[in-house]
Amino acid sequence: MGKIIGIDLGTTFSAVAQLDDTGRAVIVHNQEGENITASVVEFASNELIYVGSDAKKSLGLSKNVIAQFKREMGEDKKYETDYGNYSPKHLSTIVLGKLKKDTEEIIGEIDSAVVTVPANFSNNAREETMKAAEEAGLNVAYIINEPTAAALFYSKESGEDLSEPICVYDLGGGTFDISIIQVKDNEVEVIGSDGLQLLGGADFDRK
């Protein structure tokens, strides 16, 4: 029987989780035994592509190593390498392909996936994320906002009553979102959202 997973396709790191027998979300580690996978792609040749920590080792040393492409999702952007030019969607497909492969080696066949995106992602960026996942061989059940996913998880884990409006901040490696949310009967109502697609931890690191 196939499994349902959740994917955080992040700007700097990505992760996969699934519900265990008790209904608790647990991280599925990658082939390297890591809980998170660096969202970095290296084109070593026309046939050889590295993803994750192996690619990150060469970050900044060559134009063939690409990171933070999530920030350009939905835009007409191409990253030039010695082995071709690649869109953010194509690069995301490569990362998602590794996540799928590594996860299936541990839990078996994946039936469907829920993929999170920044709350301020444009419709084009959401569509590109959906296409990237599908091209990686994933059946996408839902695309949901990252603050919404965080609120659902916190509500379930803490047992707190979140029926009154709460503020959820999502400061990631490359994006910053804020959402005003209510949770009632496991249903999330998003009252309002805003954010910056070009502000995150990576920018603080450069300062």
Regions found by a protein language model. Give the residues of each.
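Adenine-nucleotide phosphate-binding core of ATP-dependent small-molecule kinases
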Residues: E80-K100
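Oxyanion-binding/catalytic loops of NTP- or PPi-dependent enzymes
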Residues: M1-E72, Y79-N85, T103-K207
